[in-house]
């Protein structure tokens, strides 16, 4: 979702909404406390669960971190699966298995992207404990939850929160006065705070999203035609995508911003000229079958972890190994 400007500064609109934010915060704290104390039931989990989520509403780089974490788990000898809500899809309560050939209208865009990139079982559904159970029945011994930090009904063994280095915690206020889903104090109880971007304090667990060469959405090996392009973004933080295009030297004739998880139609991409159209990988998974597919490209990104993040995740997985009695 797009972030209102007043969420990034503590101005009059934010202060005017502070009473509503206080009510929202009280509800969040109460609900989490009820689950923690066992007054609301949380089903047992048959396998360890690692949640990768955020406090800040909107895009922070969470999905690339999930993909990287899955790779790390496999290197440690685990057989991971991914579970997600499937925002923008029709999975409902689920659980529904997602494969590389799934319809994004059913699975949602991010789960489909992860299914294609990670080659591990992916399940979606609003009932997170049920998706974890489905992953276990599929033969997995650890689950990574893409988002779900606030899904308190789902038991978890570790929590990783992702922050954007530029926006951090915005004006540090809760919804609707600010961008935060939970109080700032929640960060003290998570295992790792991973920061996406530059200009971060020394010691932060930082990572960078490194853009690569454009790839054709239809899967062909056509070379990038060059020249200026139409830049299309339907993600939570589109400015990061536009900055990545500039970083790799792709000129932008016009920007086209759509809502997060937007379901694209051919009309959305019907532009007056024949310039190439470049988009995010998350958008590309929904556009492969559109008539304009031969003009569509996406910009892949690879996560480059800093030393602190690599060490923190290594320590987390070592502790998880010991807890599960693995050698």
From Swiss-Prot:
Matches recorded under InterPro entries: LpxK, P-loop_NTPase
Pathway where it operates: Glycolipid biosynthesis; lipid IV(A) biosynthesis; lipid IV(A) from (3R)-3-hydroxytetradecanoyl-[acyl-carrier-protein] and UDP-N-acetyl-alpha-D-glucosamine: step 6/6
An example Gene Ontology molecular-function term: ATP binding
A Pfam family recorded for this sequence: LpxK
Positions of ATP binding: 56-63
GO biological process terms on file: lipid A biosynthetic process; lipopolysaccharide core region biosynthetic process
A single Gene Ontology CC term: plasma membrane
Catalytic activity entry: a lipid A disaccharide + ATP = a lipid IVA + ADP + H(+)
Alphabetically ordered keywords of this record: ATP-binding, Kinase, Lipid A biosynthesis, Lipid biosynthesis, Lipid metabolism, Nucleotide-binding, Transferase
EC numbers, comma separated: 2.7.1.130
NCBIfam families with a match to the protein in the record: lpxK
Function: Transfers the gamma-phosphate of ATP to the 4'-position of a tetraacyldisaccharide 1-phosphate intermediate (termed DS-1-P) to form tetraacyldisaccharide 1,4'-bis-phosphate (lipid IVA).
Protein family per UniProt: Belongs to the LpxK family.
Protein name in the entry: Tetraacyldisaccharide 4'-kinase
Organism: Halorhodospira halophila (strain DSM 244 / SL1) (Ectothiorhodospira halophila (strain DSM 244 / SL1))
């Amino acid at each position: 979702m797009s972030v209102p400007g007043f969420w990034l500064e503590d101005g009059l609109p934010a202060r005017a909404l502070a009473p509503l934010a206080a009510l929202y915060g009280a509800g969040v704290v109460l609900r989490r406390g009820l689950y923690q104390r066992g007054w609301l039931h949380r089903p047992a989990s048959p396998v360890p669960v690692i949640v990768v989520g955020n406090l800040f509403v909107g895009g922070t780089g969470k999905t690339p971190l999930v993909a990287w974490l899955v790779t790390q788990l496999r290197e440690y000898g685990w057989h991971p699966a991914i579970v997600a809500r499937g925002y923008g899809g029709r999975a409902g309560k689920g659980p529904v298995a997602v494969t590389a050939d799934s319809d994004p209208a059913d699975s949602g865009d991010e789960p489909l992207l992860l299914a294609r990139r990670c080659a591990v079982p992916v399940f979606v559904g609003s009932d997170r404990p049920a998706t974890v159970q489905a992953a276990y029945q599929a033969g997995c011994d650890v689950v990574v939850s893409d988002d779900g930090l606030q899904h308190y009904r789902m038991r978890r063994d570790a929590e990783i929160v992702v922050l954007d280095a530029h926006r951090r915690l915005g004006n540090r206020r809760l919804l609707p006065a600010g961008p935060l889903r939970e109080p700032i104090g929640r960060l003290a109880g998570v295992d790792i705070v991973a920061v996406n971007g530059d200009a971060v304090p020394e010691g932060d667990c930082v990572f960078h999203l490194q853009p690569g060469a454009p790839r054709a959405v239809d899967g062909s090996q056509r070379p990038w035609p060059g020249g200026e392009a139409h830049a299309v973004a339907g993600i939570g933080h589109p400015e990061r995508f536009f900055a990545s295009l500039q970083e790799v030297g792709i000129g932008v004739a016009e920007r086209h911003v759509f809502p997060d998880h937007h379901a694209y139609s051919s009309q959305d991409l019907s532009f007056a000229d024949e310039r190439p159209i470049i988009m995010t990988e998350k958008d590309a998974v929904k556009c492969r079958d559109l008539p304009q597919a031969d003009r569509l490209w996406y910009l892949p990104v690879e996560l480059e972890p800093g030393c602190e993040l690599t060490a923190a995740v290594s320590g987390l997985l070592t502790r998880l190994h010991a807890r599960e009695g693995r050698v």
